[in-house]
Amino acid sequence: MRSLLLLTVLAALAVLTVCYESHESMESYEISPFLNRRNANTFMSPQQRWRAKAQERVRERSKPAYELNREACDDYKLCERYAMLYGYNAAYNRYFRKRRGAE
């Protein structure tokens, strides 16, 4: 009986120590971690935003051929479904490569 009581007390202490939530373990003290649309970009300075937009324009201009092919395939539902099974290269070749050769 004594060992059962001791085991119960030890189990209760183990549960209390494991389930204890300290304030140090919290990831964020904020009530809501999400921002509304109006305040979403206030943490970036205008110069950083301009630089990010300029870099995005450069990336858009200098995309590799496989990325352009993938975007063309993403816009066409049948090509996208075929790509899920056989890959984007095979899907692009099936739906778009023949059309280019015919023109």
Curated annotation (Swiss-Prot):
Lineage top rank: taxon: Eukaryota
PTM field: Requires vitamin K-dependent gamma-carboxylation for its function.
Name of the protein in question: Matrix Gla protein
Secreted in keyword set: yes
Role according to the record: Associates with the organic matrix of bone and cartilage. Thought to act as an inhibitor of bone formation.
Cleavable signal peptide: 1-19
Biological process per Gene Ontology, one example term: cartilage development
Main localization (coarse): secreted
InterPro entries on file: GLA-like_dom_SF, GLA_domain, MGP, Osteocalcin/MGP
Source organism per UniProt: Chinchilla lanigera (Long-tailed chinchilla)
Residue span(s) of domain Gla: 51-97
Lineage, top ranks: Eukaryota, Metazoa, Chordata, Craniata, Vertebrata
GO cellular component: extracellular matrix; extracellular region
Positions carrying Phosphoserine: S22, S25, S28
Keywords of the record: Chondrogenesis, Developmental protein, Differentiation, Disulfide bond, Gamma-carboxyglutamic acid, Osteogenesis, Phosphoprotein, Secreted, Signal
